Amino acid sequence: MSATKTLEAVARDRVGKGAARAVRRQGQIPAVIYGGNQAPEAIAVDLIRTRTLIYAGGFKTTLFDITVGGKKTRAIPRDYQLDPVSGVPLHVDFLRVVSGQTVTVDVPVHFVNDEKAPGIKQKGGTLNVALHTVSLDVAPDQIPDAIEVDLTGREIGDVIHASDLRLPAGTYTGEPTDTVANILPPTVLGAEVEAEEAAIAEAQSAEAAEEKAEAEAEATNEKNDTEE
């Protein structure tokens, strides 16, 4: 898993929309640390640092040592809100990490060695990904950075199930038979593309015919009006 990262924060003595806006005007983001059988702690974290961490990826699967007034708390991000227009972070929720605790996280699935898969490299097949992430219920300090799937030797028609993945034992929240990915023959996607292109062409042709008919009708009406 990723190394634990550090994050400096300051305590907030006021909460609510007005207080949150004041925090944001100071270049910070309102946040809260909760859980662990302790009272929630309202904090503020640096906007630029936090935005960088969020957009770097893996934010919600990374452990943080958050320092507030000299006191260090280990926590993991559970949620964050972004401005729908600007994408600027508006708020972050951190969960305290305590001994014996597990958390449910979505871990990305990375596919490697596609150039060593005969079904893709030599036969023109396409990797069809059903699950881009897998949900794991795991101890915070055991969260994988990603789940790697080796495509070496894979042929057209091969199906990769959750049971084929190398996961921490007993952590997957789904079913072993869940399809993660499969390799489709080139004709499957080709037929879909051809059908889609044909449908688009038919729609464009119908639209053009309709516009032509409307133009002819308008021209006829104008001619009749002139003759009258």
Curated annotation (Swiss-Prot):
UniProt cross-references to Gene3D superfamilies, sorted A to Z: Ribosomal protein L25, beta domain, Ribosomal Protein L25, Chain P
Keyword hit for RNA-binding: yes
Alphabetized CDD domains for the sequence: Ribosomal_L25_TL5_CTC
Comp. bias regions, Basic and acidic residues: 209-228
One Pfam family this sequence matches: Ribosomal_L25p
Top-level taxon: Bacteria
Keywords carried by this UniProt record: Ribonucleoprotein, Ribosomal protein, RNA-binding, rRNA-binding
Segments of this protein annotated with the region Disordered: 198-228
GO cellular component, one term: cytosolic large ribosomal subunit
GO molecular function, one term: 5S rRNA binding
GO biological processes: translation
Function of the protein: This is one of the proteins that binds to the 5S RNA in the ribosome where it forms part of the central protuberance.
Family label: Belongs to the bacterial ribosomal protein bL25 family. CTC subfamily.
Assembly and interaction partners: Part of the 50S ribosomal subunit; part of the 5S rRNA/L5/L18/L25 subcomplex. Contacts the 5S rRNA. Binds to the 5S rRNA independently of L5 and L18.
Name of the featured protein: Large ribosomal subunit protein bL25
Gene: rplY
